Amino acid sequence: MIERTFVGENVSETLIDEYFKTKLVRAGYSHIDLKKTPIGTRITVFAEKPGFVIGRKGKMVKELTETLAKEYAVKNPQIEVKQVENPDLDPAIVGHKIASSLERGMHFRRTAHSAIRRVMGSGAKGVSIIVSGKLSGERSRTEKFMDGYMKHCGEPAEALVNKSHQLAKLKLGVVGVTVKIMKPDVTLPDEITILSGEIKEVTEYSEASQE
């Protein structure tokens, strides 16, 4: 019963995330943090432009609240909006900008390289961008772009790398955009830090010196 409830909550959060992703395109939507409280459900929305989430005179946030209660059966939803501190270190926002550029007809290589420069310029330890689909012809293919240091497997890849998957709808078909970012403050398991300090001379002690 507990497992079924847990799965149900995860499915619900995923559906809400997808709803916000389509509804808050102009806001530069990143992700949500959903927590249940004794009086209801607190949903924190992280976005590049919080003003678009709130809307004019609070119209948008009111619409979102009503939709969550009616269509997603969220108990007494309370929406809080927070601004993403550095959009160029957020894989969801970076991926969305790449997808939007592709939909406007920008070349995928130019778009990817431009995104990588912004991410690395913001201090990221590493970034990986994968674009897959019908990019310039009838045949589907995958193009990978990377800079810096990146963990691709194991526990470090799960714990230290933030990733997001976005879709771009082009005339030739749907193109997938996967962005992985390793942020500046990440400490790797094999990373060694040498502390600077005063070096003191140690005099060797022995019983002979006492005699």
UniProtKB/Swiss-Prot annotation:
KH type-2 domain span: 16-85
One GO CC term, this protein: cytosolic small ribosomal subunit
Stored CDD domains: KH-II_30S_S3_arch
Keyword terms: Ribonucleoprotein, Ribosomal protein, RNA-binding, rRNA-binding
Pfam families assigned: KH_2, Ribosomal_S3_C
Domain of life: Archaea
Protein family membership: Belongs to the universal ribosomal protein uS3 family.
Oligomer status and interactors: Part of the 30S ribosomal subunit.
Alphabetized PANTHER family for the sequence: 30S/40S RIBOSOMAL PROTEIN S3, SMALL RIBOSOMAL SUBUNIT PROTEIN US3
Role of this protein: Binds the lower part of the 30S subunit head.
Name of this chain's protein: Small ribosomal subunit protein uS3
Organism: Methanococcus maripaludis (strain C5 / ATCC BAA-1333)
Lineage per the UniProt record: Archaea, Methanobacteriati, Methanobacteriota, Methanomada group, Methanococci
